[in-house]
Curated annotation (Swiss-Prot):
Comp. bias intervals (Acidic residues): 135-145
Alphabetical list of SUPFAM superfamilies matching this protein: Double-stranded DNA-binding domain
Gene Ontology terms: biological process: apoptotic process
Name by which UniProt lists this protein: Uncharacterized protein YMR074C
Gene Ontology cellular-component terms listed: cytoplasm; cytosol; nucleus
Keywords annotated in UniProt: Acetylation, Phosphoprotein
In-chain residues carrying the UniProt-annotated modification Phosphoserine: S121, S126
Length: 145
């Protein structure tokens, strides 16, 4: 059996044990759930509004990117609170929400650096003008004249 597949299965099993009401204080399952920041697993509050495949997808995303899974959950909670959900959310809709959140986070992280340089000829002209003024002021101090 593939070791990555085994790790995913073990993480999912630990998550299912957490969901079944394991309040015995098991710290290992909290670590597998993304650091145990929240005692409730991702998607538990909105599970009634998700299809099983969508909940599974959200759970798998939470294993890798807990922040994005929580952002999806927050977004869906807002939709539910405003009664904008008329059907169970599908896996495809979860994927599209995830893509939107990823684009939003990437656009916030991207910064644009703009270089504005002066024209060299303008600097040279201003330098020549300054030197011409300085030469006029120092006519009586010329050593070689």
């Amino acid at each position: 059996m593939d070791p990555e597949l085994q790790a995913i299965r073990e993480a999912r099993l630990a998550q299912l044990k957490n969901n079944s009401g394991g309040t015995n204080g098991d710290r290992n399952s909290g670590a597998n759930n993304g650091g145990g920041e929240n005692s409730a697993p991702v998607g538990a509050a909105i599970a009634n509004f998700l299809e099983p495949q969508a909940l599974e997808r959200l759970s798998r995303v939470a294993l890798v990117r807990r922040d994005r899974a929580q952002a999806v959950e927050t977004y869906l909670k807002k939709l539910i609170a405003t009664n904008n959900v008329t059907h169970k959310i599908t896996e495809a809709e979860i994927v599209s929400i995830l893509n939107g959140i990823a684009k939003q986070q990437n656009s916030q992280n991207n910064s644009k650096i703009i270089f504005e340089r002066k024209d060299f000829s303008e600097d040279l002209n201003s330098f020549d003008k300054q030197n011409a003024k300085n030469d006029d002021d120092e006519d009586d101090d010329d050593f070689f004249d």
